[in-house]
Every structure is written in structure tokens, then in C-alpha cells.
Amino acid sequence: MQLTKTDFIQYLKCPKSLWLLKNEPDTYPHGEFSTFLQKITREGYEVERYVRQFFEADAARRVNFQTVFETDTGLFARADALEETPDGRTVLYEIKSSTSVKTDAAHNHLKDACFQMICAERAGQKIDAVFLVHLNGEYIREGEIDPASLLTFANITDRVAEIEEETAAEIDQALAFLAETELERAGCSCLHKSRSHHCDTFGLFNPNIPKPSIYSLPNLSQKKREELLADSTFDLLDISEGFTLTPRQALVVAATKAGAPIIDVQAIRDILSGYQFPLNFFDYETYASAVPLLDRTSPHRHFPVQYSLHVLHEDGTLEHHEYLEREARLPDQLFAKLREEIGPQGSIVSWHASFEKSRNKEMAELLPEFADFLLDINERTVDLEDLFKTAYVDARFDGSSSIKKVLPVLCPELSYKELDVQDGASAMDAWEKMIHADGEDAEVRAKALLSYCELDTLAMVEIYRIVAAI
């Protein structure tokens, strides 16, 4: 049975998940290839294109791309780049669209490269050095992309050598595990991980985990999770009164046990008393790409391309303003329009406001003519999400304070599900396609983007009205 790098990484995260994919593909719950993953894949190919340009600029270098290595035990690797140096050495290059060598739980580039090296060597190709090619996070585009400045070549030979023995053992364990004909279906290793790191097959291997569960507790530490697992505690209803939780986690448990929202009326009033009319409910949509799209921007640097603004006056009057950039350009026109529409008075109400505030700080540096305006917005910004972390907690939010979780509970008549654009990743994708489209296709995408961003701020208005009436 074939084991690729992608397979191996999946094995390290959840062996049973990979076994099911390989041995019972019809049973495996193949998820949708999300817009986010599609974008990552496209960007990976784009970075590889600039790596090719870098090497092709020096005709003396002998570099092959996508060289395949296979072993009779099932290992399969396609090397991003392989170089034969004049002194007879072979250098393996692993190409990534990140701005650093990552070694976290979600992405371990050293494991990726080590797998490729081991596969090549077991197939008979000696590897003398290993480099990880990633983007230079400090690169600022000016005109045509300069591959030599865009790319960073990190020599990870020694770091890969340090984990070679461990990785080789894991590869052999993976091959042996996949060869097993029977699989114990009860539980998988993802039980010990946070919800965001659960495998696609978590529900199949753990069908009795209730909703909400201990995985709904916000920011639950690994230590606390292990304590609950040691007692086979999954249901929030079963958490003992003496179990130590953070105040926010305790509220989620209390709301679940009460079967009703936990609402701190005085806390809500205290929070909202700091809001000043007119209330400017505000949301950005941004664009970012691995290879910078615009001059004066850097890899993965976000810049606003759209905003929606609902202005609620003290007498209840509601106005809506919006702007969508229709071409690839810095947001100077966007900010000029926003400055006309957002007055010098009143609170700026956002949800997860740190995102908007971070963009404002970055854009104040990039476009100093708007610095005073953008920093003033930051000074006036309040975060409506904060209220749903401490003052209004409902078990139906599933431990989250995301507007995508709060809105269906408080305002079920408003829904993202009917929209063509339903989240930030698809908005980014739609904007990229819109600026390269013409005529009706561009207008359809523009309309979808405007509808999505408008709902973001309208949702905040309606949620505010509900909590303000408590």
C-alpha cells in the first residue's frame, strides 16, 4: 500500500483516520476541498514557479523538479526540487508558501522534508543536504517579483538529521499499521486534542461524544483535558462542581447545566454604557496572498478591499454605507470614502475587533496620509464579541463567541447559508476572481461580496438591539 508525505502527516495526526482512508475509502467521510485549501494549493504552485525562475536564471545549475521516488515497500515521494551540484552532491529542496520553517502541531516542515529524504534514500538516491525554501516575510514588492529577494533558502540538513531515526521508525510503523486487516473502531488519538485538531473521522470513531462536550470549552488546556479524559468525562453535565475551570469555561458549563442562557444584565448594561452614539457597526473584508499582489505589500500581508458600515443613531434611525474595490490597488480610495461616511463622533462597533484594529495600524504605516484617521478609529473601537465571552453565554453557542455561532441563536431570521459568499475565505476567493473577471461575471461576484459584508454589520446591529433591550 502506498504511503505519501501527505499520508504520513495524516498518520502522525491520527493513525486510524489514515487507515480508514486507505483501507475503506467508501467509509471515509471525504470532506469538501474547501476554498481555503484550494487557495493554499494554488499559492504553493505559484511559489514553486518563482523557485523555478530562481534556478533557471543560472544555467549552470542542474535542478530537476517533481522527481519521483518509490520503494517496493510502498513509499512514494515527489521531490519539489532536486539539485546535482558540481562537486557531486545531491541537494533536496522542500518548497513551502509560509514565511518561516514551521514545527508546530499543525505543520511540521521538518517532518515533511525528512519523509522526502528517507523515501529518496530508500529508493537508492543519496541525499547530501536538505533545504526548505520559504517566502521572505520582509520582502516588499516593487514592480516585477524578484525571486532572489522573495525566497529564503533555509539549510535544515542538521535539523532533519536529528529527527531522521525517529521519523524512519514512524514511517515503518505507519506501513505496518496500514497493512493490518482489522481496526479497533472505539476511539481515536484525537480524543486528546482540541476540537480544531480533530480528524475528519472523529465522529465515526467517537460516535457517543455529546454536543456540547468538553471540546466545546474555550481554551481548555491539555492538562485539564487529560484530567477529564482520565475520568471518561465528555459531557459538560458530568463535570463535577469541584473541577477547576476558568471563569469563561465555568459559564459555558453553567449554561449547559441550566438549560438556559447565563445572562449578566448588569454586566451587559455596564459594557453598553461605554458605547457612544451614533454607533458605527463596521466590518472589513481583506485580501492576502503568499506572493504579494500589489507593490508596497509583503507575503501574507492583509489589505482591506471592502467595508460595510451600518450607522445606528440614538433615535433608532439606521443608515447603511458600503464600498467594494473593483480592481487590484491599495485601499487609498476605500479609506477616502470611509472618511466621508464615518463621522468624528460615536463608537466604532466591530466583532473580533483586533482584526480590524491590526489592519488599521498596518495601513496607517503603509498610507500615512490616513494615519490620524485610522488610529482615531482604533481609539473609538469597541468589540461587541466581548459581551458574549463574559455577560451572555448560551450552550447553543457551543463554547464559541463567533458571530457565526451567536447569530443563528439570537437572530435565526438572518442567515449566511443563503449567501453565495459565506465566510472570509470565500470572500477573499470571490474578490480575487472578481478583479480578473469581466462583465456579468464580475458583477455577480461583486453583488455576492456586498451581500456578505452587509450581513456582517447588519447582524451586529440586530444582536446589539437584542442585548440592549435586556
Regions found by a protein language model. Name each.
Residues R62-F69, F76-E83, L92-E94, H109-Y139, ...:
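Conserved DEDDh/DEDDy metal-dependent 3′-5′ exonuclease domain
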Residues D7, D26, L37, L150-Q276, ...:
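Cys/His-rich finger/ribbon microdomains and the adjacent scaffold used
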Residues I95-D104:
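Short beta-strand-loop-alpha-helix junction that forms the active-site gateway
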Residues I145-K211, D231, V406-I470:
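Acidic, Mg2+-coordinating catalytic module of metal-dependent nucleases/exonucleases
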Residues M1-R89, Q222-L251, A255-A258:
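Metal-dependent nuclease catalytic cores that hydrolyze phosphodiester bonds in DNA/RNA
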Residues S216-L237, E241-A250, L318-E325, R329-G346, ...:
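Terminal, non-catalytic protein-protein interaction segments that mediate quaternary/complex assembly
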Residues E48, Q53, L92, A267-P344, ...:
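Conserved RNase H-like, two-metal-ion catalytic cores of nucleic-acid enzymes
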Residues S97, T286-A288, D386:
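Short, glycine/acidic-enriched loop or turn micro-motifs at the edges of active sites
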